Swiss-Prot record:
Keyword annotations from UniProtKB, A to Z: 2Fe-2S, Electron transport, FAD, Flavoprotein, Iron, Iron-sulfur, Metal-binding, Pyrimidine biosynthesis, Transport
UniProt key word Flavoprotein: yes
Lineage: Bacteria, Bacillati, Bacillota, Bacilli, Bacillales
Pathway as given in its UniProt record: Pyrimidine metabolism; UMP biosynthesis via de novo pathway; orotate from (S)-dihydroorotate (NAD(+) route): step 1/1
NCBIfam families per the UniProt record, alphabetical: PRK00054.1-2, PRK00054.1-4
Gene: pyrK
Binding annotation for [2Fe-2S] cluster: 221, 226, 229, 246
UniProt protein name: Dihydroorotate dehydrogenase B (NAD(+)), electron transfer subunit
Organism of origin: Bacillus cytotoxicus (strain DSM 22905 / CIP 110041 / 391-98 / NVH 391-98)
Length: 259
C-alpha cells in the first residue's frame, strides 16, 4: 500500500564515483514486499526542484524498519539529495509500481539477473528473495568503467557474479552480452534492469525465454496520473495501446512493450 512519510536518514555514503548509498528509516518500510518497486523522493523543502525523483529500492530490512537505495548524483535534484545528513528527514512516497515476479522462479532453477549502471540496485533485493526460496542466481553487472562499479562483493555473496565494463578497466571488456557469450551462461529465467540499449539486446536474444525487464523512464507524478511515462505495446502496431511505466510497470514481461 502506497504511503507518504517523512523518513529519517540513517546514513549516506558515496560508494563509487557519484554513486550514493542512502539508508532511510520509517514505518513505510513495512509496505515494501515486492522487489523492483521504487519510491518517489522529494529532494528539497522548497519548490525547486519541483518534481519528485524516482529511485529504486535496493534493500529492505523490515526488522529495523530501514531500506536502502542507490542513486547517481548527476542533476540538480540528486545532487541536492546527496547533501542529506544523518538524522535529517526525507519526504518519501511509496512503494510504487509493480516489481519483479519472484514467484515465476522455482526452487532448483537458475535465474540470470542482468543489470546495467544504475539499473543494478533493484536486482540486489530480488536476488536475496530468490536465494531465500532456493533459486540459484547468476549476476551480470555492466558499468562504463571501474570507478563506477558498486556492490560486486555483495552480489558475489549470493551467487556467481560477473562484471563487464565498456572500457575494460574491470572484469570483461564490453557489454553484458559479451559475458553471456564468453562464459556460455545458461538459465531458466531472466530478470533485468538497465538502459534501453541493453534491454533491446537481451530482448533480441531471449524473446522466447521466460524473462522480465524493468524500464528506466523519466516520471512526473509516479502514480499514473500525468501520462509522462507511457510506453506502447508491441501487440498493437497502430501505437494506440500503451501502458504507464510508473503504475503498470516498471517491470514488464519481455516482448510486451516497445523498447
Amino acid at each position: 500500500m502506497m504511503q507518504k512519510q517523512n523518513m529519517i536518514v540513517v546514513n549516506q555514503t558515496e560508494i563509487a564515483k557519484n554513486i550514493y548509498e542512502l539508508v532511510l528509516q520509517g514505518d513505510l518500510v513495512q509496505q515494501m514486499n515486492e522487489p523492483g518497486q521504487f519510491v518517489h523522493i522529494k529532494v528539497a523543502e522548497g519548490i525547486t526542484p519541483l518534481l519528485r525523483r524516482p529511485i529504486s529500492i535496493c534493500n529492505v530490512d523490515q526488522e529495523k524498519n530501514e531500506f536502502t537505495m542507490l542513486y547517481r548524483a548527476e542533476g540538480q535534484g540528486t545532487k541536492t539529495l546527496a547533501k542529506r545528513k544523518q538524522g535529517e528527514l526525507v519526504d518519501v512516497l511509496g512503494p510504487l509500481g509493480h516489481g519483479f515476479p519472484v514467484e515465476e522462479a522455482e526452487a532448483g532453477q537458475t535465474a540470470l539477473l542482468v543489470g546495467g549502471g544504475i539499473g543494478v540496485p533493484p536486482l540486489y533485493e530480488l536476488s536475496q528473495r530468490l536465494v531465500a526460496k532456493g533459486v540459484r542466481v547468476i549476476h551480470i553487472l555492466g558499468f562504463q568503467t571501474k570507478d563506477v562499479v558498486f556492490y560486486e562483493e555483495k552480489f558475489a555473496e549470493l551467487g556467481d557474479t560477473y562484471v563487464a565494463t565498456v572500457d575494460g578497466t574491470h572484469g570483461t571488456k564490453g557489454f553484458v552480452t559479451d559475458v553471456i557469450d564468453n562464459y556460455g551462461i545458461d538459465f531458466d529465467i531472466l530478470y533485468s534492469c538497465g538502459p534501453l540499449a541493453m534491454l533491446r539486446a537481451l530482448e533480441g536474444r531471449y524473446k522466447e525465454k521466460k524473462a522480465y525487464i524493468s524500464l528506466e523512464e523519466r516520471m512526473g507524478c509516479g502514480i499514473g496520473a500525468c501520462f509522462a511515462c507511457v510506453c506502447h505495446l508491441q501487440e498493437d502496431p497502430s501505437g494506440h495501446s500503451y501502458k504507464k511505466v510508473c503504475s503498470d510497470g516498471p517491470v514488464f514481461p519481455i516482448g510486451e512493450v516497445v523498447l
